[in-house]
């Protein structure tokens, strides 16, 4: 979920045939590390971030797989692009050669009605043909059934597998 935490965990696994996904927030100042070390980014919600990733992806590496993060709830405090703006961001990303637009990612609010999942699924279907999308990432451990019913091809079920995440305390 966090770039620095991921990099620390990646180091001892260097050389293994693993595919690395960033599913957490991506700040502009972390794009170089992500462009150089990850295979997927699930949380692109601004053209500026997409352009930085594209510019910083090393030549010779496969294109970075990208999911556009959609703000499913419409809450200003949540990350993601508004559904009405997804097509424009998708077009901008699709034009960047070192990125490969793969699909959409959304995190509906806890307890969201199934209709919220269906709305994002419908948006994915609308854009699928135009952009060649193949990945819809909806749902987590608590709502994976609703997500799959809405067409999700990738669910984030870390809590169901590993349990609740432990909070890391600052030493200061």
Roles of regions detected by a PLM:
Residues 1-142, 148-150, 162-164:
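Conserved alpha/beta-domain cores
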Residues 153-154:
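Divalent-metal-activated hydrolytic enzyme cores
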Residues 148, 157, 161-168, 172:
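Expand to "…catalyze enediolate/carbanion chemistry for C-C bond making/breaking, isomerization
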């Amino acid at each position: 979920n966090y770039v620095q935490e991921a990099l620390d965990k990646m180091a001892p696994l260097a050389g293994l045939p693993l595919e690395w996904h960033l599913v957490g927030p991506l700040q502009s100042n972390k794009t170089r590390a992500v462009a150089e070390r990850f295979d997927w980014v699930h949380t692109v919600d601004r053209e500026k971030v997409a352009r930085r990733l594209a510019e910083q992806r090393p030549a010779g590496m496969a294109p970075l797989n990208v999911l556009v993060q959609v703000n499913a709830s419409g809450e200003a405090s949540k990350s993601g692009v508004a559904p009405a703006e997804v097509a424009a961001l998708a077009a901008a990303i699709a034009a960047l050669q070192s990125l490969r637009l793969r699909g959409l990612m959304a995190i509906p609010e806890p307890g969201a009605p199934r209709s919220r999942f269906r709305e994002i699924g419908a948006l994915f279907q609308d854009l699928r043909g135009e952009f060649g999308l193949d990945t819809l990432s909806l749902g987590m451990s608590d709502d994976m059934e609703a997500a799959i019913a809405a067409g999700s091809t990738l669910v984030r079920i870390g809590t169901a597998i590993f349990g609740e995440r432990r909070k890391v305390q600052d030493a200061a």
